[in-house]
Amino acid sequence: MNIAIIGATGYGGVELLRFLQHHPHVHHCSLYSSSQDGIHFSESFPHVGEIEGAILQKIDVEQMADECEVVFFATPPGVSSTLAPTLIDKGVKVIDLSGDFRLKDRSVYEMWYKRQTASDHYLQQAVYGLTEWNKEDIQKAQLLSNPGCYPTAALLGLAPLVKERLIEEDSIIVDAKSGVSGAGRKASLNTHFSEVNENVKIYKVNSHQHIPEIEQMLKAWNERIQPITFSTHLIPMTRGIMATIYAKAKKELSLETLLDLYKTSYEDSKFVRVRKPGQFPATKEVYGSNYCDIGVAYDERTGRVTVVSVIDNLVKGAAGQAIQNLNVMMGWDEESGLMLAPIYP
Amino acid sequence: MNIAIIGATGYGGVELLRFLQHHPHVHHCSLYSSSQDGIHFSESFPHVGEIEGAILQKIDVEQMADECEVVFFATPPGVSSTLAPTLIDKGVKVIDLSGDFRLKDRSVYEMWYKRQTASDHYLQQAVYGLTEWNKEDIQKAQLLSNPGCYPTAALLGLAPLVKERLIEEDSIIVDAKSGVSGAGRKASLNTHFSEVNENVKIYKVNSHQHIPEIEQMLKAWNERIQPITFSTHLIPMTRGIMATIYAKAKKELSLETLLDLYKTSYEDSKFVRVRKPGQFPATKEVYGSNYCDIGVAYDERTGRVTVVSVIDNLVKGAAGQAIQNLNVMMGWDEESGLMLAPIYP
Amino acid sequence: MNIAIIGATGYGGVELLRFLQHHPHVHHCSLYSSSQDGIHFSESFPHVGEIEGAILQKIDVEQMADECEVVFFATPPGVSSTLAPTLIDKGVKVIDLSGDFRLKDRSVYEMWYKRQTASDHYLQQAVYGLTEWNKEDIQKAQLLSNPGCYPTAALLGLAPLVKERLIEEDSIIVDAKSGVSGAGRKASLNTHFSEVNENVKIYKVNSHQHIPEIEQMLKAWNERIQPITFSTHLIPMTRGIMATIYAKAKKELSLETLLDLYKTSYEDSKFVRVRKPGQFPATKEVYGSNYCDIGVAYDERTGRVTVVSVIDNLVKGAAGQAIQNLNVMMGWDEESGLMLAPIYP
Amino acid sequence: MNIAIIGATGYGGVELLRFLQHHPHVHHCSLYSSSQDGIHFSESFPHVGEIEGAILQKIDVEQMADECEVVFFATPPGVSSTLAPTLIDKGVKVIDLSGDFRLKDRSVYEMWYKRQTASDHYLQQAVYGLTEWNKEDIQKAQLLSNPGCYPTAALLGLAPLVKERLIEEDSIIVDAKSGVSGAGRKASLNTHFSEVNENVKIYKVNSHQHIPEIEQMLKAWNERIQPITFSTHLIPMTRGIMATIYAKAKKELSLETLLDLYKTSYEDSKFVRVRKPGQFPATKEVYGSNYCDIGVAYDERTGRVTVVSVIDNLVKGAAGQAIQNLNVMMGWDEESGLMLAPIYP
């Protein structure tokens, strides 16, 4: 099968390529870049070496539609909402790693993103690709909206609690910590090594665009869920997200009950691993892999549940989950091309 | 004035020395170490160079009592509770950077620290050295118990809210992130570079010994305060603590009111700097200095206050605050020897 | 095929497992540990998850000989020289990642390692596994001595120059920079995060045990080679070695000639990639992979050649090259199980 | 005394301010910025807090000449060569941290910097501010050209060997490793955290503009010195330079002789510290301070001397040495305002 990657020279794009190069069902990737067309991919990323035919091409939607069955967008806001409709109309499958199709309500999108997005027609047919919980819809999707990195970590951690209605609906707080690669490859003072190293920063306090994305899914699971508090911190590391999640239990719980619930919820999910009592995952334990590792605690003193959910933001939080969704959409083994162990240390 | 440092070869000790070397009222520091007596300090720490008389001495309480007016303990649990009483009885002033004298209730200490501590007699006379809020008692103290690094960041961030009773008493959550130097200089797998770098870990979930220390002070300010949720994360950096604090407002607040309260609360405190609306401090902005920087947000969607409080764990969280307390105890300018600007970048 | 790993809980061991898990010709790995036998591997390394049968076993050479065709030693000095002879005598193939069998001359070993090693009988039959240059001998080896991390980077960078006798024999200087994982997983002050982070250190000046290993191979290629200067620096990163190599050209050279030589030397080597004129590799460009990337410069002002050679110390510098040697020893495709792309960023 | 800083919002500028704020002889610093005039300095650098009068001003040379006795340039190439002549002509003292006035020969400047610089008139009166070795000239200087960071580390390490003619004149190789802050505060892909972290890069191979600066000084000390090999590596840390220096001894030396020479050479230099036999400095041991620490080795096997010289690139390699030069120019104590101990860890 031929696939195309638009935005191949960003971190999401290069990570898609890392996995797709060894994917058993993908024969060829065409790489597109609006800024670097004409040059060989290895000029930007010498680590990939000499891949045959890896010349970056100018974005040409018509050509893509002729040559490829699936197109991945690993692009900044506003690109996929502009280009994807033509591809959709021509019958191409689209997997969008940007936020353009994630929010069903355009006014919510505009409020949080401060810009316009696609028309309702396309927004409504977009399927939200949180693979573990939306598999049926994903199987039928033509337009797949891949979740944000933070929402992936937060939602996989919250799902069992929210669906089972074990926690107070107005008590959810997510304190998230992310590596720097989540900010993309564009150079800025915020990603300057000397500003990030030996430093922890909070950013976009109460205003991160992933807040409505998380709430939309939580409300789909339990309509009573109230607005959440969600904070994002920049940590001096390249990869990894940890979401530390706090919520008040409706009634007294036991750690055993909680862990049973999580184990059961994810027993068929190859990529979600629940830790033993008293053990919690570190981000490095999923480094470079598609795993989401989860640890759970219950505190009798406060009646609060603490859930710790970690992912590699570029894999399960972006390229890996996108390929997982590709696998589901095509009816392939969900794990195809994704069974790489984390790199440790 | 002559002072002594016990535990001079730990990170707390070497940081005490960095500031005391240039302190206008301190003439000589005697350095004591149980493990390295007889060698010159610069053997362990070449960065200090040739300081005259910096031979590490064997711990001898009698000799100290003869030669020094003030003794600093920068030691592991159990040392100061054993040695300080003799010094106290001989009229020496003691400033203890360990946790031995922080909790007034011995049973609480034993539950969280899993060991015994000093007798009630000494516990009761120990003054808790959160300088900004306990100045009157500190002026009269002979035995000063210097706050823990996390409690310093958390309490300075919480004080105005709790004292003014603006928040629900059962709603406090503190999500804290710390650099590795907080774990001390002892080598262990937990501080191994290859295990810490490119990694975020949560540890001691719901069981950190700083929880009762924070709660003790909060209850002294407002007896209705309920048990808090307090989480600690290890971040791949050497210095710095950020406490991200969440609490539910009792009634609707405005950011303006909140910032006014914080500005007023700390207007006489040289070392606490409150940020402008919409601005939040990063740990690097206090690096190497005795500052605690604070930013505040109020979220109308959730009715929650978010407070971000950052310190250098080895300075305001340890050696710096200890010297600030020394200054207050001796009646000197509170800032003596401490007015070093943060190092940036 | 069944294989065994002795020293499975070190960084070399866990990296062997990462690659062997997906190796097409390896059916089962038995894991041995002298310090942690009886526990499941995932207790030490949660990132690997639930691998069936990954209980760490007590080292039992007889049992290994019965069950396994190949035994890997990823052990500290002195272990393989003690245990390997029995395995060899029983016909088992041994691949040793330690330095025990690398030096042919016992007195040289004793001078640099300050300890004794195996008897001459076994030393002489050991084949040095610098795969790209010793393939014929490796194919016939029963006892394979895997090169050190530094020697791998240095020798692959020097080989074409030395074999073609293009450089003055007394002019070789290798300035090497290594990540911390090269020091192993044992906790020590030298690997403490707070001591390594924001720091560069030189160590073992003129006394590193890899010096005789490099010289032995260089002299095998050109007996006139004189003692080299070789310096090792500890860099605040987990993985990666860069060897910056300096040597005086015997006569004027051109960059074109040099690059032709390198391209030709390695044209059949999948894992050695030579950069274009003016381009030099960074360690991150081989991260997690078995590649050795090389860049070359010639300076007309000084008449010196500069070669920059980078590897991942745990892969091409240890586990990866060991598996590459396994592949050659067994007559399999040299790349089997090793074609993972570097992780970037 | 009033001084001015042009380019106050770069890393050199902010570091000048850190030291000058506490300088006993400096009463007021005026801060100038071409890009951010009109805003308060703390908007760019919240860590400095509320300094009275720290509004960034538009560059106005006439005004500066009226108000200030000394002007520091911490600016990109081309600024000081344009603006300084007016100040010089008006009798203002100028200390230039850029490279504009470092090379006496304009054609050499143009070859290495690929741009034009000041006229011969000003180049010839500029005094090169390697304080330890040029003190007499510095005392009389009106235009002081502050050395580059790499040349400072390299020259302080080489001086005793070159002046005493102990080494072969064509044998000098300097392998330098630098933290990222040396590249300035401008955002670029080369300083992006995700590209720098877990990575070592070599850059400007055989073409760094500091090469002629080092050679010019070496030749002033010994006219027979031949072109040197000088390599620069980017290391994942914020501050610090290590220069590892290799040279062939003319005749057999002893470590004792060498160390005696270094100790004697620097016995009157407060800021150069020579290590004991067998000990070598790490960059962290001078962090945030004006020290240059030096270790020396002699290898009998190769007849080569290895010198390890470390500085904080922003202090002794920039702002600190500039203030040291200010002190000498004004006849003040050379250490005024500079006696801060390194921060460790």
Swiss-Prot record, chains A, B, C, D:
Q: What is its main location?
A: cytoplasm
Q: List the disulfide bonds.
A: none
Swiss-Prot/TrEMBL catalytic activity: N-acetyl-L-glutamate 5-semialdehyde + phosphate + NADP(+) = N-acetyl-L-glutamyl 5-phosphate + NADPH + H(+)
Active site positions:
149
Annotated metabolic or biological route of this protein? Amino-acid biosynthesis; L-arginine biosynthesis; N(2)-acetyl-L-ornithine from L-glutamate: step 3/4
Where in or outside the cell? Cytoplasm
Give the protein's function. Answer: Catalyzes the NADPH-dependent reduction of N-acetyl-5-glutamyl phosphate to yield N-acetyl-L-glutamate 5-semialdehyde.
Q: Which family does it belong to?
A: Belongs to the NAGSA dehydrogenase family. Type 1 subfamily.
State what protein this is by name.
N-acetyl-gamma-glutamyl-phosphate reductase
